[in-house]
């Protein structure tokens, strides 16, 4: 039986490339000359450093524009609160969402069951497996989920025939 998985994960290679491009632009921009503005990446966290709140906003704008150019959906990012560190400097931790949350997976299963399409949906850890008899049914489920779930970026992978 054909099946696929519904997941929520960013392309980490593109995220890393966007961070490197952001750091390169920040180091060459005139308004950041002499400041300690930078963006760091560890595991599923991005940390933006700047001299003040205004420059932190500028750093985040650069980062988000680079991510958009590299086709990384900014809905993957969960912005934390701005923290003061030594002197006037500030930082902000931005977490990268990974996996489909419990509430969202239940919502996806409910949407699939309510759609009356002949497929089954089952929650498997941080993914939702959709199984159906025909490939056309699976494609209609993908179209329906793209239309109905707009608050979280969904990826569809692990297609089996």
UniProtKB/Swiss-Prot annotation:
InterPro entries: DUF520, UPF0234_N, YajQ-like_sf. The keyword Lipoprotein does not apply. The keyword Nucleotide-binding applies. Gene3D superfamilies: YajQ-like, domain 2 (3.30.70.990). Coiled coil: none annotated. Belongs to the YajQ family. Nucleotide-binding protein. This is Nucleotide-binding protein Bphyt_3208. It comes from Paraburkholderia phytofirmans (strain DSM 17436 / LMG 22146 / PsJN) (Burkholderia phytofirmans).
């Amino acid at each position: 039986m054909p099946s696929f998985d519904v997941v929520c994960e960013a392309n980490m290679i593109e995220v890393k490339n966007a961070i490197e491009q952001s750091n390169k632009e920040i180091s060459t921009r005139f308004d950041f000359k002499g400041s300690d503005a930078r963006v760091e990446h560890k595991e599923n966290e991005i940390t933006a450093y700047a001299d003040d709140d205004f420059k932190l906003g500028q750093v985040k704008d650069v980062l988000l524009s680079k991510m958009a150019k590299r086709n990384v959906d900014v809905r993957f990012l969960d912005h934390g609160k701005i923290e003061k560190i030594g002197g006037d400097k500030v930082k902000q931790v931005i977490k990268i969402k990974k996996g489909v949350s419990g509430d969202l997976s239940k919502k996806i299963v409910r949407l699939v069951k309510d759609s009356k399409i002949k497929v089954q949906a089952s929650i498997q850890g941080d993914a939702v497996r959709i199984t159906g008899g025909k490939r056309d049914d699976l494609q209609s489920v993908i179209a329906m989920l793209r239309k109905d779930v707009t608050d979280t970026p969904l990826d569809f992978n692990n297609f089996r025939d």
